[in-house]
UniProtKB/Swiss-Prot annotation:
Sites where the protein binds ATP: 2-10, 25
GO molecular function: ATP binding; protein kinase activity
Similarity comment text for this entry: Belongs to the protein kinase superfamily. Ser/Thr protein kinase family. STKL subfamily.
Name of protein: Serine/threonine kinase-like domain-containing protein STKLD1
Protein kinase domain sequence ranges: 1-202
Gene it is expressed from: Stkld1
Transmembrane segments: none
Originating organism: Mus musculus (Mouse)
Keywords tagged on the record: ATP-binding, Nucleotide-binding
Key word Lipoprotein present: no
Domain remark text: The protein kinase domain is predicted to be catalytically inactive.
Residue ranges of the region described as Disordered: 639-662
Amino acid sequence: MLNPGALGVNLVVEELETETKFLIKQVECIDEHHANKALEELMPLLKLQHPNLSLYHEMFIMWNNEISSLFLCLVMDYYSQGTFQNIMENKRKLKAVVDTEWMHTMLSQVLDAIEYLHKLNIVHRNLKPSNIVLVNSGYCKLQDMSSQALMTHEAKWNVRAEEDPCQKSWMAPEALKFSFSTKSDIWSLGCIILDMATCSFLNDTEAMQLRKAIRHHPGSLKPILKTMEEKQIPGTDVYYLLLPFMLHINPSDRLAIKDVMQVTFMSNSFKSSSVALNMQRQKVPIFITDVLLEGNMANILDVMQNFSSRPEVQLRAINKLLTMPEDQLGLPWPTELLEEVISIIKQHGRILDILLSTCSLLLRVLGQALAKDPEAEIPRSSLIISFLMDTLRSHPNSERLVNVVYNVLAIISSQGQISEELEEEGLFQLAQENLEHFQEDRDICLSILSLLWSLLVDVVTVDKEPLEQLSGMVTWVLATHPEDVEIAEAGCAVLWLLSLLGCIKESQFEQVVVLLLRSIQLCPGRVLLVNNAFRGLASLAKVSELVAFRIVVLEEGSSGLHLIQDIYKLYKDDPEVVENLCMLLAHLTSYKEILPEMESGGIKDLVQVIRGRFTSSLELISYADEILQVLEANAQPGLQEDQLEPPAGQEAPLQGEPLFRP
């Protein structure tokens, strides 16, 4: 005879022919009606088939003449390896933590068995450590499933509770009032998990008092969870989520078994179990994810790691970080932290929403860190750059994603040293394709132009072919957005840098000149634009007489020379603008055919004034002297304005509406 259970006596018997041992549970019944009702409820259990359920082999009713009582006898397999209760008792004596791998293995089997029962709408009703038997060191089974009729025998329960108060401590609050459901099994399972997690620091009495306390005071659980965290009990992060929702006083607020399995097996420590592998295809419920993500940034990152394969968890985690107050983000983030987040997100590179949120987070983290400290070093590892480029390629039609990625790249490139790496990643060709696809989208165009401006400043060696194609698209963008000041400013800078690299084709020269002059006229007050436009014009005029002719020649009352004089009046106290202006004029004077036009346009007088104002700028004086020397040497009667022809072999500029007014 074994120790009696809550409802009856347990006998170990042996079959004479096979010498096979069985366990017979004898449950005393009130009367024949009570016995028959319990038997009727339990008969369907004979048909159950699950590897982690100790099934009933036979059920019968017998009369005991000695005590004049009727008994329901339940025959099941006998296992001599002990139960979970024996394991917990041994661990308590040693004050030892339950082996993590063993616990994961056993818990996966228990959960799988309970899920099987609950899918059939069968309630175990009697879950506790002593009813989880060990077949061997890595294999367990649930036993002693009960019926409503047996579990609602109040008089018997009261007697047993007085004999052994521990028996009822595993039961849910509503089960003590004889109301059972699948959610009462969840409570009992939560108590078992709690017992396994605390056996190293709570003795039997303390553990039982805790189980009783949480029925009436849910707050009793929090100090224990805190202690588990302090003692670094393995799996505490999962217990923090599971136990409050399994041990909720209101049954309807408790997790269902499938939710318990999802939370448990989707953490990284459970991925090796067969049940866990099956669970990878299921989604984590939103409310569970939200509870997981409560807390500080470190907690959120732990969740991202533990549920790295779950896209729905990653999306909510990233969005949580996006909305987190700045003082909680822990800025600036080191490169290692960014790489950790990106490594997780790379698993979900096909999911647009995740990529969009992640790139938005990068934009926020990098942008705010730079705003706090302009001298702060921006993370720009190969992993980060590769991720951003892969993201651009993965969803080339998403306006929002493309725009955000280029903004992030612009921040990273603001400190230089990545032009070569981005060139190797094919950035210039990709930028050309994106400009072509989104040339009507002002924000995307501006983001791309701003990035190119930053990159081309320190580019060393380049393959000219993609940049030559890129220059054509830049001119198209400027022509598409003729009144946009910011696009004009960024576009002028890019065209200047491309001209320095020799990446503007001769067939594009005239169009580029028109766009640069038009941009100056559109935005004369933007000093960056004016400087870069003058530099671009000077760079092109240095190599092309056609460019020089196009700048100088009158066209229906308009001339670039008049615009140059107007800009000087506006910036006569700015030596940088005046120096770039003189550099352009110096290159123009290298073409003899246009010298008369420059003379008649008042350039000589203008340069003389400039030379007198900027006596301390050696570079500027050098340009001025060069211009004056050429103009004075050629001060002779020349062609009249109406006789001036374009250089040999070149077509005259197209006639049309005047671009510039004197």
